[in-house]
C-alpha cells in the first residue's frame, strides 16, 4: 500500500461539526472498520487549525483513497499527496533518492536483470541461476535495517512470475472455513510491523572443515528489515483451525527439478500448530515501508522472526493444515541437523569494523560489530585482540526481540604485523558462541566465534 498525506479544509459555515449528526457521520467514516471496507488504513489524523484536517493514510491507489474521502469533498477541499516513511527513505538510500510507490503491481523480474541488480548493489553473487548472493561485510555497517537492494538473496529455484491481480492466498485443509484471499483483502486485514533479522541456515558454510556441498556462503547471508503484514494467527483464526490439525504447510509459487526426485517440486516448509503462538509469524507484503520486492517474495511471504530464513517462505500461495508430520523435501531431506529440522537461529556475532585485511595504526581504535540470536536477546558481546583476554563490548541501539544488536569496543592495537580480532556473543537464554564450528553433513548453523585478520603497523 502507498502512503499518502491528506489535507482537508472547509469554510466556517461548512464545518460539519456544527451539526451533531453530520459530525458523527464523518467521525464514523474515519473509523478503522469503515476505512478498511474502502481498502484504506488511517495511520494518524490531526487538526492543524479550526477548519483544517490532516491525515496520514495508506491505500493501494489514490483513486481508492479519494473514493473514501468523497464526503469530505462535499464540504470543502481535499488535497492528496504521495508520501513516504522513514524506513522507506533509509532503505532507498536517503532523501535524495526517488521514493518507491507502494502499489498493487510489481513487474516480473527477468533472471538476468535480477543478477545485474544484485551486482550493481554490491552483493557477492555465488550463483546466477537460481540467484544466490550475500551482503559483503562492509555493507552491513549502518543502522538497524538493511536497504532492500543490499539484502542478501537465497533462492532454490527460478524467480516465479506472478500476476498480482490473479494471485490468491488459499487457506485449506483441516479448517472450518477455507479461504481464498486477494492481495487487497490481505492488506485490508489488521496489520502490524516487526523488525526481524533473517539468516540463511547455511551462512558460514565456507568455514566448515572438511568442506560440505551446498552454496559456499561466507558470513554475509544475513540481513535485517522492517516487515509489515498480517499476523499468521489472524488469518488462521478467520479460517478456523480444526482440533485434529498438527502442522501448517506453506507452499510457494517457485518450483523446479531436484536431483533424485521425479518431476519439478514446489518449495514447501511447515510449522507445527503448537509453535504458532510463540513464533510471531507474519504474512508480509511490505519490506522497509515499500512493496515486498520480487526477489524477496512479492506479493506475499511468510516471515518467522528468530528462525532461520528457510522457514520464511517466499512467493506464498497456499497454507494447508494437516494432521500428520509434513515430509516434504525441504523439511526432511534438507535443512536439518541429524534429522532435526533447523528452527531458531543460533547466537552469533560478526566483526564488521575494521575490515578484514585493513591496515590499523598502533593505538586506540573502535572495533564494531553486530550480534543476534533466535532464542533470546543478546546480553553480552566480548572481543579478543590477538588471542588476548576477552573484553566486554558496549551494546548500542534499541533492544529488539528478533533484530540484531550493534556493539562496539575501544580497543588498543600494538606492534606490527598480522593481528586477529575475534568476537563472541551470549544471549539471555544462556547460549554462547562455540570456539569451533559444529560440523554437520549439510553445513547448517555454523555460529563459531568470528575472526578477522588485520595488519597492524
Language-model features and meaning:
Residues 1-52, 60-63, 86-101, 105:
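Short S/T/G/P-rich N-terminal loop/turn motif that feeds into the first structured element of a domain
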Residues 9, 83, 384-386:
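Predominantly extracellular/luminal cell-surface or secreted proteins
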Residues 41-47, 68-70, 160:
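Short, flexible, solvent-exposed loop/turn segments with mixed acidic/basic and small polar residues
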Residues 47-51, 73, 216-219:
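Short glycine-enriched loop/turn motifs at secondary-structure junctions
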Residues 52-54, 77:
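Short active-site oxyanion
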Residues 65-73, 185-186:
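Short amphipathic alpha-helices in soluble, non-transmembrane regions
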Residues 74-87:
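Conserved short beta-strand edge segments in small beta-sheet-based binding/regulatory domains
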Residues 106-457:
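Structured, non-membrane catalytic/scaffold regions adjacent to prosthetic-group chemistry
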Amino acid at each position: 500500500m502507498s502512503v499518502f498525506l491528506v489535507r482537508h479544509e472547509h469554510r466556517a459555515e461548512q464545518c460539519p461539526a456544527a451539526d451533531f449528526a453530520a459530525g458523527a457521520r464523518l467521525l464514523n467514516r474515519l473509523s478503522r472498520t469503515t476505512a478498511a471496507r474502502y481498502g484504506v488504513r488511517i495511520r494518524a489524523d490531526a487538526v492543524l487549525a479550526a477548519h483544517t484536517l490532516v491525515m496520514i493514510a495508506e491505500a493501494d491507489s489514490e483513486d481508492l483513497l479519494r473514493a473514501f474521502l468523497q464526503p469530505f469533498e462535499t464540504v470543502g477541499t481535499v488535497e492528496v499527496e504521495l508520501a513516504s516513511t522513514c524506513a522507506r527513505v533509509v532503505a532507498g538510500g536517503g532523501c535524495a533518492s526517488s521514493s518507491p510507490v507502494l502499489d498493487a503491481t510489481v513487474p516480473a523480474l527477468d533472471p538476468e536483470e535480477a543478477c545485474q541488480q544484485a551486482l550493481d548493489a554490491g552483493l557477492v553473487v555465488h550463483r546466477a541461476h537460481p540467484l544466490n548472493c550475500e551482503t559483503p561485510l562492509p555493507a552491513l555497517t549502518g543502522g538497524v535495517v538493511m536497504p532492500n537492494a543490499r539484502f542478501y538473496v537465497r533462492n532454490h529455484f527460478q524467480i516465479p512470475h506472478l500476476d498480482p491481480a490473479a494471485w490468491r492466498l488459499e487457506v485449506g485443509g483441516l479448517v472450518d472455513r477455507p479461504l481464498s484471499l486477494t492481495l487487497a483483502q490481505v492488506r485490508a486485514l489488521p496489520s502490524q510491523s516487526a523488525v526481524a533479522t533473517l539468516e540463511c541456515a547455511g551462512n558460514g558454510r565456507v568455514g566448515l572443515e572438511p568442506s560440505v556441498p551446498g552454496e559456499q556462503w561466507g558470513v554475509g547471508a544475513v540481513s535485517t528489515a522492517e516487515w509489515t503484514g498480517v499476523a499468521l494467527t489472524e488469518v488462521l483464526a478467520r479460517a478456523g483451525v480444526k482440533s485434529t490439525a498438527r502442522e501448517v504447510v506453506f507452499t510457494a509459487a517457485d518450483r523446479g527439478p531436484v536431483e533424485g526426485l521425479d518431476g519439478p517440486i514446489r518449495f514447501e516448509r511447515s510449522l507445527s500448530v503448537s509453535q504458532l503462538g510463540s513464533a510471531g509469524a507474519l504474512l508480509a507484503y511490505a519490506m522497509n515501508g515499500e512493496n515486498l520486492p520480487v526477489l524477496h517474495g512479492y506479493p506475499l511471504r511468510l516471515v518467522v522472526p528468530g528462525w532461520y530464513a528457510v522457514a520464511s517462505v517466499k512467493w506464498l500461495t497456499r497454507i494447508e493444515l494437516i494432521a500428520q508430520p509434513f515430509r516434504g523435501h525441504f523439511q526432511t531431506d534438507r535443512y536439518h541437523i541429524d534429522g532435526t529440522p533447523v528452527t531458531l537461529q543460533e547466537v552469533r556475532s560478526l566483526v564488521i569494523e575494521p575490515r578484514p585485511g585493513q591496515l590499523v595504526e598502533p593505538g586506540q581504535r573502535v572495533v564494531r560489530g553486530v550480534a543476534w540470536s533466535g532464542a533470546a536477546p543478546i546480553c553480552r558481546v566480548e572481543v579478543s585482540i590477538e588471542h588476548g583476554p576477552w573484553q566486554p563490548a558496549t551494546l548500542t541501539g534499541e533492544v529488539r526481540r528478533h533484530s540484531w544488536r550493534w556493539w562496539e569496543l575501544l580497543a588498543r592495537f600494538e606492534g606490527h604485523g598480522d593481528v586477529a580480532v575475534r568476537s563472541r556473543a551470549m544471549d539471555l537464554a544462556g547460549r554462547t558462541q562455540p570456539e569451533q564450528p559444529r560440523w554437520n553433513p549439510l553445513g547448517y548453523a555454523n555460529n563459531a566465534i568470528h575472526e578477522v585478520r588485520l595488519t597492524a603497523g
